[in-house]
Amino acid sequence: MAGAKEIKTKIASVQSTQKITKAMEMVATSKMRKTQDRMAASRPYSETIRNVISHVSKASIGYKHPFLVEREVKKIGILVISTDRGMCGGLNVNLFKTILNQIKNWKEQNISTDLGLIGSKGISFFRSFGFNIKGQLSGLGDMPALEELIGVANTMFDAYRNGEIDAVYIAYNKFVNTMSQKPVVQQLVPLPESKDDHLNERQQTWDYLYEPEPKVLLDSLLVRYLESQIYQAVVDNLASEQAARMVAMKAATDNAGNLINDLRLVYNKARQASITNELNEIVAGAAAI
């Protein structure tokens, strides 16, 4: 059994680690709440744009934007959103598994894939697989700006316009609640129909006057909508990261507490054994006299 002094040193070390994990848990909780607020604030914007796009595209303007036209799919581009930092449980691993399974399914259909990567964890992971990476970005921090994301996003959209890829998907961790984050791979381009599109079909298409003309408006709105979807996904993933880190750090803090209790028990037993030995020596010495 280790000596009492050595055990006491271990207890102090674990207590120091526990303070760090507790602080990280509190920081993650605060950041998660702030990110949730940004996430909630951005949703109405993208939903409103989506409804207007649906209305304009259904109008008889004799124009179909390339982002609305389905084509034969031979190659797909995936915009992967991961974290820059670790200590967030299996968040990234679960997302990467989902992406690899989807890529495998497409490969069985003779569909190849290109990647655009946001987040250092995704960059380091997918580089090792030899994928064709069309663009990458890392170091966004806790408050990403849309201007920082546009470069990688435009790389994928330009490839779609030029016919290099036939569809663009986005993969990220969707924030469900504090205890649940769901990895999703969803289509961005061609723009899939939403549930509201069928409702909009019942509405008359001549009850609005558009300024500028519908074609110019549609071109502009589609770009804004896709940018908002990417930003929403990044914020969603960030909220998922902070929630996963909060849970992981709470588990680490609780485990540290359990370990401290176990070490204290061992420490008390070691002290008891030491005291017993000292008493035995005193008794033996007294008997010898």
From Swiss-Prot:
HAMAP family: ATP_synth_gamma_bact. NCBIfam families: ATPsyn_F1gamma, PRK05621.1-1. The keyword Aminoacyl-tRNA synthetase does not apply. This is ATP synthase gamma chain. One of its GO terms (biological process) is proton motive force-driven plasma membrane ATP synthesis. It is found in: Cell inner membrane. It is a peripheral membrane protein. Its main location: membrane. Keywords: ATP synthesis, Cell inner membrane, Cell membrane, CF(1), Hydrogen ion transport, Ion transport, Membrane, Transport. It comes from Haemophilus influenzae (strain PittGG). One of its GO terms (molecular function) is ATP binding. GO terms for cellular component: plasma membrane; proton-transporting ATP synthase complex.
